[in-house]
Amino acid sequence: MEYEQLIPWVKPVETTEDGGWKEASAKAFRVIPGDYVTTEDGTGIVHIAPTFGADDANVARAAGIPSLFMINKKGETRPMVDLTGKFYLLDELDEAFVKECVDVEKYKEYQGRWVKNAYDPQFTIDGKYDEKAAQAAESLDVYICMMLKQAGLAFKMEKHVHNYPHCWRTDKPVLYYPLDSWFIRSTAC
């Protein structure tokens, strides 16, 4: 079963053997089976984000579903959100990628927007994060929900309070990125 991309601002790409990339939206928007979702814990249906989760990436890779990456000016694949917590600016992206894979009219109002208010510098005063001010301001997720509702694309919207990981040093919500990492066991000295 296939479906239409809900916010078609960027087309998925896949890397090629020669180190390049190609547009791959024809493979992307499909319902696929998985053995880690049950009806005992919910509907039995889950959205996956292959760009941001190891389990999701493995399931998508096995089904041939490409990730939703941006291609920067260096030719590197990057998630839509940069390491500072905001959507990439169009002028930071590869021109050929933008021409072939980005709906500039739809994406331009989101470029440079912070995905979580906690990462917007206006909510950090003298090195201290002002959580109350950040929560009081309109967040991008609320903005996107309202855009979907106005476009008639939202079936139902309601707020759910749930646990979300926060950094123990900054109290800011954790943003996940597909990064190569290495660790040093400092307790083994």
Features from the language model and the residues they span:
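Non-cofactor substrate-recognition interfaces
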Residues: 1-189
